[in-house]
């Protein structure tokens, strides 16, 4: 199974991806996480340091792809999760998306796609185009990470559009498995968006300080819980997500709305709270009538 995880930059994709990878490994799966970001920090919390990237290795090999072996680019991490980092050109130079596309192709050529139960692509931000869209060419499922904010849902809407387009043009099925809410004490905007653009909500993680600290420490929650047992409840969020993924959900081909419609939808939610409350009361009344 291949998973592509997308979401707004800075939303906590990499921290979430690493913990989901460990959760899948705890369920007995052999997992490879591929970091698709020029910052090459996707797998940081699996080791506590930045591993050599595909670009680093190619430079050493003088860009002779035929001289690259799996052990040159695949590195062991905590919990038995293997890791690859694409890397990218220096800031302000080259194309990070091209490097991501080449990383995906190289991983396939090295037979990495066939050696693991789960391949998890952790992909840069919401730029689902060019090389950054290449993981969707191979993924069985896309998972979107978002919070209860406008920018994250704008990114969610654009990612949904990309998934729909890829699902339309691909011969291999691609589905949106659902949305994971991260750092989300409230979920009113998420619920409002999902009401208009239906998609499964796999999990909602509240704002938990230990998750932020885990990123700084370079550890997953599963490693931290070994010395801090009270964090078991946080691990359960990720294990629940992993269990839903492993159940091979039907998933959906999502729909999206225009940017202007999204602006109106979310801003009206706060600008017209009375109207929203009246609508909710009408819906509750209708539900009561149906039950009677």
Swiss-Prot record:
Its cofactor is [4Fe-4S] cluster. GO terms for molecular function: 4 iron, 4 sulfur cluster binding; ATP binding; metal ion binding; oxidoreductase activity, acting on iron-sulfur proteins as donors; oxidoreductase activity, acting on the CH-CH group of donors, iron-sulfur protein as acceptor. It catalyses: chlorophyllide a + oxidized 2[4Fe-4S]-[ferredoxin] + 2 ADP + 2 phosphate = protochlorophyllide a + reduced 2[4Fe-4S]-[ferredoxin] + 2 ATP + 2 H2O. GO terms for cellular component: chloroplast. Pathway: Porphyrin-containing compound metabolism; chlorophyll biosynthesis (light-independent). Keywords: 4Fe-4S, ATP-binding, Chlorophyll biosynthesis, Chloroplast, Iron, Iron-sulfur, Magnesium, Metal-binding, Nucleotide-binding, Oxidoreductase, Photosynthesis, Plastid. The keyword Manganese does not apply. ATP binds at residues 10-15, 39, 182-183. Its main location: plastid. It is an enzyme of class 1 (oxidoreductase). It comes from the Eukaryota. Gene3D superfamilies: P-loop containing nucleotide triphosphate hydrolases. [4Fe-4S] cluster binds at residue 95. One of its GO terms (biological process) is photosynthesis, dark reaction. Its EC number is 1.3.7.7. Binds 1 [4Fe-4S] cluster per dimer. Mg(2+) binds at residue 14. SUPFAM superfamilies: P-loop containing nucleoside triphosphate hydrolases (SSF52540). It is found in: Plastid, Chloroplast. Component of the dark-operative protochlorophyllide reductase (DPOR) that uses Mg-ATP and reduced ferredoxin to reduce ring D of protochlorophyllide (Pchlide) to form chlorophyllide a (Chlide). This reaction is light-independent. The L component serves as a unique electron donor to the NB-component of the complex, and binds Mg-ATP. Belongs to the NifH/BchL/ChlL family. NCBIfam families: DPOR_bchL. Homodimer. Protochlorophyllide reductase is composed of three subunits; ChlL, ChlN and ChlB. This is Light-independent protochlorophyllide reductase iron-sulfur ATP-binding protein.
């Amino acid at each position: 199974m291949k998973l592509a995880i997308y979401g707004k930059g800075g939303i906590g994709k990499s921290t979430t991806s690493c913990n989901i990878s460990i959760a899948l490994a705890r369920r007995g799966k052999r997992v490879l996480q591929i970091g698709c970001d020029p910052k090459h920090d996707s797998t940081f919390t699996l080791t506590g340091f930045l591993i050599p990237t595909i670009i680093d290795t190619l430079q050493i090999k003088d860009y002779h792809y035929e001289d690259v072996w799996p052990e040159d680019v695949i590195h062991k991490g905590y919990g038995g999760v293997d890791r690859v980092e694409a890397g990218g050109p220096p800031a302000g130079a080259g194309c990070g998306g091209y490097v991501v596309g080449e990383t995906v192709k190289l991983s396939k050529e090295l037979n990495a796609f066939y050696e693991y139960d789960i391949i998890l692509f952790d992909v840069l931000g919401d730029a689902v185009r060019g090389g950054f869209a290449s993981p969707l060419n191979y993924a069985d499922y896309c998972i979107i990470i978002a919070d209860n904010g406008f920018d994250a849902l704008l990114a969610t809407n654009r990612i949904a559009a990309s998934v729909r387009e890829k699902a339309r043009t691909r011969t291999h099925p691609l589905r949106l498995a659902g949305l994971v809410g991260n750092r989300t004490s409230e979920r009113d905007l998420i619920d409002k968006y999902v009401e208009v653009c239906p998609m499964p909500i796999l999990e909602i993680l509240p704002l938990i300080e230990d998750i932020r600290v885990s990123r700084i420490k370079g550890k997953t929650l599963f490693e931290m819980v070994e010395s801090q047992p009270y964090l078991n409840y946080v691990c359960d969020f990720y294990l629940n997500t992993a269990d839903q993924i492993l159940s091979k959900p039907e998933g959906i081909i999502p729909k999206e709305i225009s940017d202007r419609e999204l602006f109106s939808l979310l801003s009206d939610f706060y600008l017209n709270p009375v109207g929203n409350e009246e609508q909710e009361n009408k819906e509750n009344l209708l539900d009561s009538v149906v039950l009677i």
